[in-house]
Structure formats: C-alpha cells, structure tokens
Design a protein with these regions (language model features):
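Membrane-proximal helix-turn-helix segments that form the acceptor-binding/catalytic region
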Residues: 2-30, 45-46
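Acidic anion/phosphate-binding donor-loop and adjacent secondary structure
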Residues: 39-43, 59-75, 131-132
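Conserved donor-binding/catalytic core segment of Leloir-type glycosyltransferases
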Residues: 78-97, 103-106
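Nucleotide-activated donor-binding/catalytic signature segment of Leloir-type glycosyltransferases, i.e.
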Residues: 113-117, 124-152, 156
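A short hydrophobic beta-strand element within the catalytic core of glycosyltransferases
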Residues: 161-162
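Aromatic "clamp/platform" in nucleotide-sugar-dependent glycosyltransferases that forms part
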Residues: 166
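Short acidic/histidine- and often glycine-rich active-site loop of Leloir-type glycosyltransferases
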Residues: 175, 189-199, 203-206
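Short hydrophobic beta-strand element within catalytic cores of glycosyltransferases
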Residues: 183-186
Length: 207
C-alpha cells in the first residue's frame, strides 16, 4: 500500500489526484491555524503556488478563563495543598501524544525528595490500569468531559498543564489551559510554539 518511490504507492496516487484537482481552480485558497502548518503548505508541491494564509484558531474566553483555584479544586474534590499536574488526551497511549515522555518526566520528579504532595489529573480518556500503575503519584482519571465548563475546571485546578504531543497542527488544549491562566509545558513542535512563550506563560522543551 505504502511503497515510497513506486508510482502505484497509495500516497503517490493521492498526491496526483490532489494535484489535478487543485490545478483546476485559480481561486483556491488555503488557511492554516499555525505558523508551522503555514510553512509546510508554502513548501508543499501541492500548495506552494497557491495563496496560503495564517489564521489562528479562536477560543471562547467566556468559558475558558481564570477562576479561583480553591473553588475549582473544591468542586473536583482535589486537595487544596497538592501540586496538580494535568494532562489531557482522548487516547493517552497514542504515540503522538507523548505519554512515554511524560511518564519519564514524572519518574524523575519522584526522585526529587523536595517535591511533595504531587498528583496527576488525566482527562479525555477512561481509566487505564497500565497508565495508572506507571505513574508514581496519586492519579485521577476524569474521563471524557462532556462540556467546556468541566474542562475549564480541570485547567483551573491544575498548577501546570503538560502537552507532550510530538505532532500537533495547533493544540487546542494548550490554548484552553493558557486562557485559564495555567502555565503549559510542551515540546517545540507543530503549532505549540505559537502559543507558549518560553519561561513566560510556560516552558518549551526541545524535541
């Protein structure tokens, strides 16, 4: 199916089909939510000769906004004295979500005896025993959150949000957490650097 260099490779077929389609229209425009995706489009053989615009995604900041951390923790039944690390993914085990990197980071934190009362909040996915057993701190799985208010509560209850994604066209969770006033740690990949200002509202790690 995927055989690089071969004419009948599926990706080559899709490329030719798209190239034929795009060449039919002179008024075809492309919009990118991140500078990274914008640069990719400008370099692509499919779109480099087409107008490409960088238009960041928007967010309803009447829903995602800072609220009192103590109140958020009270609603979620999270201990007020804990240092809370939040992480969100529909499929935690997806290699693109960077779970293995977060796991290693948590193991390093555990080795620091000066750090006490750390807990981890995971939302977006159901309880996963393998993941839970791999985390050296108290962990709560919040499940799939059905509304923005509940998601906002998690961001506000957290001291830091971790976005270890290895591939992200934009990264809505990053924007949501920052809009709630919660610093974000993430890799300098995809659209994440568009939102995290290194050591100002978060930390950009090299990948």
């Amino acid at each position: 199916m995927f055989s690089p260099g071969k004419r009948n490779d599926l990706s080559a077929k899709e490329f030719r089909k798209k190239l034929k389609l795009y060449s039919k229209y002179n008024n075809l425009f492309f919009a990118s939510p991140s500078r990274w995706l914008f640069d990719c489009a400008k370099e692509s053989l499919l779109t480099k000769n087409k107008p490409v615009f960088y238009i960041p995604n928007i967010l309803d900041n009447t829903l995602f906004k800072p609220i009192d951390k103590t109140a958020a923790r009270l609603i979620l039944n999270v201990d007020a004295v804990e240092t809370v690390i939040a992480f969100g993914a529909i499929t935690v085990s997806s290699p693109y979500k960077g779970w293995t990197y977060l796991q290693k980071a948590l193991e390093l934190l555990k080795q620091d005896d000066s750090l006490k009362n750390i807990s981890v909040l995971i939302f977006g996915s159901a309880y996963n025993k393998e993941i839970a057993d791999a985390i050296p701190f108290k962990t709560r799985f919040m499940g799939y959150l059905l509304d923005e208010y509940s998601t906002s509560l998690v961001y506000n209850a957290a001291d830091v949000f971790i976005a270890p994604s290895l591939a992200e066209a934009f990264g809505y969770v990053v924007m949501e957490a920052l809009s709630c006033g919660t610093p974000v740690v993430g890799f300098n990949v995809g659209g994440i650097p568009d939102m995290i200002r290194h050591k100002e509202n978060g930390y950009l790690a090299k990948y």
